[in-house]
Curated annotation (Swiss-Prot):
Record's protein name: Homoserine kinase
Domain of life: Bacteria
Gene Ontology CC annotations of this record: cytoplasm
Residues annotated as binding ATP: 100-110
UniProt xrefs under HAMAP family: Homoser_kinase (MF_00384)
NCBIfam families listed in its UniProt record: PRK01212.1-4, thrB
Catalysed reactions, as listed in the record: L-homoserine + ATP = O-phospho-L-homoserine + ADP + H(+)
Family to which this protein belongs: Belongs to the GHMP kinase family. Homoserine kinase subfamily.
Length: 324
């Protein structure tokens, strides 16, 4: 029996001004998926979820409804029809959830990317990571009803990912500045993506759109030029953050605490409730994280939180172990 364990890390979608078109991966934490290959088919469905650890029983065990197993099923269909690789055996899947659910940290994308990189290894790596990204994006449709790439693409590919187009899919990889560190703080509360999207306006004034476009362009330029001051000036979201900030207890105080501690900028991670900040050194990033946690704790909701500091992940989804 061959087993493969895949890992994919947390991601931050939107990155302030890049609503639905920009995301990045951090090095930790992340989800793990263990796939075990068996020679004999045990049921009509070739994939079974044997266990999920760390979700508190919240995620479905139905392989067609869980994002990690769903993407493996799509992968198997793809390699059969396009690579000529047939499979008559069975795959057992174990999902180890190290990312909180409904957190704004790309939890479902990490599960999908980890499962896909493991499945690809299990069958001799017939697909490129760019091919696998398509399945990871479809996994997001199962998880939240929308096939978006701002978490799925960086979870698979690492780095910053700019989504120029969905049809056709056009992803642009942007390498991070070498001294850019991310701080990610997750308050102990949940915020459903569907609700966070429901508060957004259906249309915005042209002047607001112009301001947002300017910030997106400036952020990309700042990353490419390693201009940390420009990165900080560009981390301004005039579209989603003003509507979502009231949904996160203490957000304004947390953001101000991050800036006061030396962060280049700070905003909501994805749809929240997690909050991220950028700094130009690890020491500053850690001080920023402590200040953000303290602000959450001293907010009216008195929220406990978890905090991670890491450089931007350049590797993306990866294999962490194999056995034969």
């Amino acid at each position: 029996m061959k087993t493969v364990t895949g890992f994919a890390s947390a991601t931050v979608g939107n990155v302030a001004c890049g609503f639905d078109v920009l995301g990045f991966a951090i090095t930790e934490p992340g989800d793990e998926v263990v796939l075990a290959l068996h020679d004999e088919r045990r049921s009509d469905c070739p994939v079974s979820i044997t266990s999920i650890v760390g979700d508190g029983g919240a995620l479905p065990l139905d392989p067609k409804k869980n994002t990690s197993s769903f993407v493996v099923l799509k992968f198997l269909e793809y390699i059969r029809t396009t690579k000529g690789i047939s499979f008559d055996g069975h795959i057992d899947l174990v999902l180890k959830k190290n990312l909180p659910l409904s957190s704004g940290m790309g939890s479902s994308a990490a599960s999908a990317a980890a499962a896909l990189i493991a499945a690809n290894e299990l069958f001799g790596s017939p697909c490129t990571k760019m091919e696998l990204v398509h399945f990871a994006i479809e996994g997001e449709r199962v998880a939240c009803g929308s096939a978006h790439a701002d978490n799925a693409a960086p979870a698979m590919l690492g780095n910053f990912i700019l989504i120029r187009s969905y049809n056709p899919l056009d992803l642009i990889t942007i390498k991070p500045p070498k001294n850019l560190f991310g701080t990610l703080v997750h308050p102990h509360t949940e915020l459903k993506t569907s609700f966070a999207r429901s508060v957004l306006p259906k249309s915005i004034p042209l002047s607001t759109a112009t301001q947002q476009w300017g910030n997106v362009g400036a952020l990309i330029a700042g990353l490419l030029m390693e201009d940390y001051d420009l990165i900080g000036r560009a981390l301004v979201d005039v579209v989603a953050e003003p509507k979502r900030a009231p949904l996160i207890p203490g957000f304004n105080e947390v953001k101000q605490a991050a800036l006061d501690a030396g962060a280049l900028g700070c905003s909501i991670a994805g749809s929240g409730p997690s909050v991220f900040a950028f700094s130009s050194s690890r020491q500053t990033a850690e001080a920023v994280g402590s200040a953000m946690q303290s602000a959450f704790l001293h907010s009216r909701a008195a929220l406990q939180s978890d905090m991670w500091v890491s450089p931007i992940c350049s590797q993306g989804a990866r294999i962490i172990s194999t056995t034969s």
